[in-house]
């Protein structure tokens, strides 16, 4: 906080007195996880937003609410559907390596023809 006050003196009189940094959750493919857990009926997941939680939260919440109410996704949500991960993805080493890679690319420039 002291460093922030040094850079922006106006913060001394602002209402901000404490900064809080929360943990982020990233997924192996960089897409968030949404939908009913395949192994647990009526248990819905909305997680792993890869730092897009605020930006995607409203739409993801609406989509999941419709999913719960209508017993299925309201439109094609396969890119974020929890079912896209299966037994082959249970390998902890693979998940860790892919998640680190997704995190590392999160803020990079999205160039055309760049390999994933």
Label each residue range with its predicted role.
Residues 1-102, 108-114:
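C-terminal catalytic lobe of FAD-dependent flavoproteins
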